[in-house]
């Protein structure tokens, strides 16, 4: 009997201490509602806030591990102690009532009570009226957010650190992503401009030749005439002698031609004349396939870039600036010719 009373006194003192620390009523602790609420809060802190363990989460709300264990065992411990207390009380009363002559009545009345040592009452039954989290906010709109703003002690430091950390992380991620995208875009533009600039400079410094297409056409025509005359039948001897006399008369040199021929034959023995004549023969046997376009440089040695007029639209187009004519052609290709507005008479 004395041990049960001492245990009850210690439980009452410990319950008072926990109630003063947490602000939870003693009835809620004994019924188990306090442990369920604290357990849910600790789980939320570990899951959502990122605490490393239960001890850290308990210390953040002002509880120790012993208090948490006591709150867990309080309902069962209370039931056990009270049962033991009742049993010892009944035994004591039984002794006194036996002495007084009422043992039979006490034994008969207490036997039915002691047959239900485990209580059949629902332990999850609410002992206090349940109020939702937004109860006062429903009655007085805005009061919950106002009181939360005034409560600068409970969770203020951790919330501030978390908010500042999230802001710094979001800013760093956003700036890093923007810097990477800008660097990739600038690199692609720079590479494209360098490639187009290299093509433009190569075209400016290249040697351009206009192919002589008429000469090739004439050679094909005269080749066909030559084949035509080659297939004609031969001439008779009288016609041949007549043609030879005509050619001999046309090729007869005059006095000036004879004098120049004598001078040339006299100089043929010199080495420089022989070399010059050999070069003339070589040059006459070789001919170009087209006409070379002369390249003009900047006047005065300014070493500036020079582009012919016929190449200027192409060079400007490589640098992104096109002529109005070219722009009109592109618009017609992409969007089609402009439709003329029909005039109504």
UniProtKB/Swiss-Prot annotation:
Keywords: Capsid protein, DNA-binding, Host endoplasmic reticulum, Host membrane, Host nucleus, Late protein, Lipoprotein, Membrane, Myristate, Viral penetration into host nucleus, Virion, Virus entry into host cell. One of its GO terms (molecular function) is structural molecule activity. Residues 329-345 are annotated as: DNA-binding. Signal peptide: none annotated. The keyword Lipoprotein applies. GO terms for biological process: symbiont entry into host cell; viral penetration into host nucleus. This is Minor capsid protein VP2. Residues 289-324 are annotated as: D1. A lipid is attached at residue 2 (N-myristoyl glycine). Pfam families: Polyoma_coat2. A motif (Nuclear localization signal) lies at residues 336-344. Belongs to the polyomaviruses capsid protein VP2 family. One of its GO terms (cellular component) is host cell endoplasmic reticulum membrane. The lineage of its organism: Viruses, Monodnaviria, Shotokuvirae, Cossaviricota, Papovaviricetes.
